[in-house]
Amino acid sequence: MPLFSFEGKTPNVHPTAFIAPTAVLIGDVTVEARASIWYNAVLRGDLNPIVVREGANVQDCSVVHVTARAGVEIGRGATVGHNCTIHAARLGDEALVGNGSTVLDGARIGTRAMVAGGALVTPETEVPEGMLAMGTPAKVKGPLAGTPAEFWVKANPEGYQKLAQRHLASVAEVARGV
């Protein structure tokens, strides 16, 4: 797994966390127990810290970056879907950011809230606890409870923790055939 120090700051990864071999962590990045960082994800904590809390997951091809003014915190059991950008924002516990979404500077996604796939959460936007936001720019549409999307917020934390442990135990690079 590519881990790089930056100006004396080095990534700190818990032994039970899964970091895919093609993920890249740079600088002041903390990945807590049972969290997972998936293939081709990049977490660049060069100007401020990035903290990925226990059991959270940052999926394939996502980018997490900071600014000189703010870092990133991804709450316990939160999900950053495939191909997302999280920039100097905060995600609450068990929040879910759907595939292909962008969450910009100073945005706050509440506990068990969901940002639908493809959404653009503009700077300083707040998605309150338990709410569903969608669109470009993202707007809060109402409570997540009782919607089909609620399943993913509930299922993703445990599902990705189990899948990460399987990858941690069995992923191995293979030689290319000649």
Model-derived segments and their meaning:
Residues 1-12, 46-54, 60-62, 66, ...:
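Glycine-rich hexapeptide-repeat left-handed beta-helix
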Residues 1-37:
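N-terminal segments that cap or nucleate solenoid repeat domains
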